[in-house]
A protein has these predicted regions:
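A short helix->beta-strand "capping" segment at the edge of beta-propeller domains
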Residues: 18-30, 198-200
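Conserved beta-propeller blade repeats
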Residues: 30-45, 76-96, 102, 121-147, ...
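Active-site-proximal cap/loop segments of hydrolase catalytic domains
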Residues: 51, 470-664
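Structural motif
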Residues: 55-60, 101-106, 154-156, 185-187, ...
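Short loop/turn segments that connect beta-strands within beta-propeller blades
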Residues: 66-69, 109-113, 192-196, 242-246, ...
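Predominantly five- to eight-bladed beta-propeller fold
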Residues: 146-191, 236, 275-276, 283-290, ...
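Cap/lid segment of the alpha/beta-hydrolase catalytic domain
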Residues: 227-228, 394-516, 521-523, 555-562
């Protein structure tokens, strides 16, 4: 057992305090998303996401004057603006939005006036994610390159009958189970801003994304998977396409993957994210991405940031002498700066919390979204010298006067001597001498992390008087490559023990926790672990697996990506006897051991973890006589998005816990 950090203190109760956070408050919470500084560094355009309606969150775009902190809306209300990017001259903003029934590329003055629809943009329901920039300006501001699906009929898989020929035949999670991959490919188009004339630069059976226009104006960087069967091998490489005639040259040809390329200011060097291992899946990988650079012709590829943690997309300083990048670190996401010439690394933003979207100005100013344990993401700015300055107070009307639970961090030595860090949220209003329930809230991935960021679910539970424990079990990121690799071939193994050991440690460290009122929940892989844990122990009074896997064999063949387990176990199920191993590591195999009342939560349109995983476990639990209920949310994919559903599941969860915590 090791050190403990106090990450936040109780928000003081002000006059007229309203208690802690309530489920209905989710309708009022807002968060800063995408952040982009103007070329002069004096203004920032940023998105604000809010959930004031019953449906999915919506976003608005605003422009902030950095010096004064004054903000104004950009674009028409309800236009669905996204991807806003400044022109190189700083006099216009390009963005994606709607004009009537059409969705496309729009250019406007920086005050939102003179908005003009330049080109229609089409999408695809192809399931695997793309990364990086969707649009990029030419240096002279006369053209914009963007990503769009090529026009054309959809695939026969949406007809009657539905004819399936692709390996990845299912769509994104939100499309539903009766619609299939439309087979539209994403390609690069260039629009002339003045006339709206559009040229298609790339074609074929591939997908392009992650754009960056060269400083000389002659080429556009992009990322694409050009394997003979892109559905089977997600090997992303970096290419450049000539803006004048669409001639493509390949810059990398590795067995690993490259992402987010960006030109240096002089156009001689390209920085990007890369991995080293042979890659088979982009849905999840235990290998951390690191920052690399190469010459503009693709030669002299080298890893420049040799820090043992997962790094985010790099940006160049204006003089080209430094690279900035984010990196996960023990539950946090910090911003760093490195000089490729001497390798020296300096921390730029180091506060406990998470740096989200960020943008670098010419004079070293950084504008960024930042969340801590006490607030969702707000807009901040930091000059080259001096400390951070907060520019927005989006949630003052919700959080002022609310009592939030403070958050501790502690590290425990788990099985095999592995150190595992956990974060514990206290009850918002603890009662002296009283015991409180504890909910183990398990993150998904498994290659992800939890940390000192605002967690609305944890704070709602804290307001009810619960403690909430989040464990960065082996397999989590933010603790080095060896820690992320430690789950390889061992799902539902030692990482489940990490959670139980962390609970044991919490019971010793915090005497206010009631060992007789423990709950467990998690989403996706966290839901899988919740399912597994109730087959291993009866110590939990109630369980709430969300979007959970119960049968690793059926999951492998029904999810929209079919090689995730091949990555995690080193073989496909039909190889090396893995089918038997997967069944042996499936919670469904041991359902007769379950005694814990279980509420299964799932989106009906989930193609990531199909709802059949919840259906199997639900019927099996009923067969063995366990108190169980399945809550199915229509229109939802992998994870709930509609605000009314988020509120509903929190209210249901608390009722479920309260019901079973009272049973002795």
């Amino acid at each position: 057992m090791k050190h403990r950090h106090i990450l936040a203190v109780l928000v003081p109760v002000l006059a007229g305090a309203q208690g802690g956070l309530q489920p209905a408050d989710l309708h009022r919470l807002k968060a800063v998303g995408d952040v982009q500084l103007a070329p002069d560094g004096a203004r920032a355009v940023y998105t604000v996401t809010h959930s004031d309606g019953p449906g999915r969150p919506t976003s608005e775009v605003r422009v902030m004057e950095i010096a004064t902190g004054t903000s104004r809306p950009f674009g028409r209300a309800g236009e669905g603006v996204s991807g806003a990017r400044w022109s190189p001259q700083g006099d216009r903003i390009a963005y994606f939005g709607r004009e009537g029934e059409k969705f496309g590329l729009i250019v406007a003055r920086t005050d939102g006036s003179e908005a003009r629809f330049v080109a229609e943009v089409l999408g695809t329901n192809h399931p695997l994610p793309t990364s990086g920039e969707r649009l990029t300006w030419s240096p002279d501001g006369r053209h914009i390159a963007y990503v769009s699906a090529a026009p054309g009929p959809e695939a026969d898989a949406n007809g009657d009958p539905m004819v399936i020929t692709r390996y990845l035949y299912k769509p994104t999670a939100g499309e539903g189970l009766t619609r299939f991959n439309d087979n539209r490919r994403l390609h690069i188009f260039v629009a002339e801003v003045a006339t709206g004339r559009v040229r298609q630069l790339t074609d074929g059976t591939y997908y392009e994304h992650s754009l960056d226009w060269s400083p000389r104006g002659d080429e556009i960087l992009f990322v694409s998977n050009r394997e003979p069967d892109p559905d089977r091998f997600f090997n992303y490489d970096i290419f450049a396409v000539r803006a004048s005639d669409g001639v493509v040259r390949r810059l990398t040809e590795t067995k690993s993957a490259e992402y987010n390329p960006t030109w240096s200011p002089d156009g001689r060097t390209i920085a990007y994210l890369g991995t080293k291992r042979d890659l088979t899946s982009s849905e999840t990988t235990m290998e951390d991405t690191h920052v690399w650079v190469m010459n503009a012709d693709g030669s002299n590829r080298r890893e420049v940031v040799r820090l043992d943690n997962r790094q985010g997309a790099p940006q160049w300083s204006a003089d080209g002498q430094s690279l900035y990048f984010t990196m996960q670190d023990h539950g946090n996401v910090h911003l760093y700066r490195q000089s490729p010439s001497d390798g020296q690394v300096m921390k730029v933003l180091t506060d406990w919390g998470t740096v989200g979207s960020w943008s670098l100005g010419g004079d070293g100013v950084v504008a960024y979204a930042y969340t801590s344990t006490t607030h969702p993401a707000e807009l901040y700015v930091r000059a080259r010298t001096g400390g951070p300055r907060r520019l927005t107070q989006l949630n003052a009307d919700v959080l002022t006067g609310r009592r939030l639970g403070r958050v501790d961090s502690f590290t425990v030595r788990s099985v095999g001597g592995r150190e595992v860090q956990s974060f514990l949220t206290f009850p918002a209003e603890p009662r002296a001498g009283a015991k409180a329930p504890l909910i183990a809230l398990i993150h998904g991935g498994p290659h992800g992390q939890q940390g000192p960021a605002f967690n609305a679910s944890a704070q709602v539970y804290a307001a009810r008087g619960y403690g909430v424990l989040m464990v960065n079990y082996r397999g989590s990121t933010g603790y080095g490559q060896e820690h992320a690799d430690a789950i390889f071939g061992d799902q539902n193994g030692a990482e489940a023990q990490d959670v139980l050991v962390a609970i044991d440690s919490a019971l010793i460290r915090y005497p206010w926790i009631d060992a007789d009122r423990l709950g467990v929940e998690g989403g996706s892989y966290g839901g899988q672990l919740a399912n597994w844990l109730v087959t291993r122990t009866t110590r939990f009074k109630a369980a709430i697996p969300r979007a959970s896997i119960s049968n690793l064999v059926s999951f492998n063949y029904t999810a929209y990506y079919h090689d995730y387990l091949a990555v995690e176990f080193g073989a496909f199920p039909h190889q090396r006897g893995l089918m038997d191993t997967l069944w042996a590591r499936s919670p469904l195999r041991y359902v007769d051991r379950v005694k814990t009342p279980t509420m299964l939560v799932h989106g009906e349109n989930d193609n990531d973890v199909p709802i059949a995983e919840a259906e199997q476990f639900y019927v099996a639990l009923r067969d063995v006589g366990v108190e169980t209920v399945m809550v199915r949310y229509p229109r939802e994919g992998h994870g709930l998005r509609e605000t009314k559903h988020l509120v509903d599941v929190l209210e249901r969860s608390m009722r479920w816990y309260e019901r079973w915590f009272q049973v002795q």
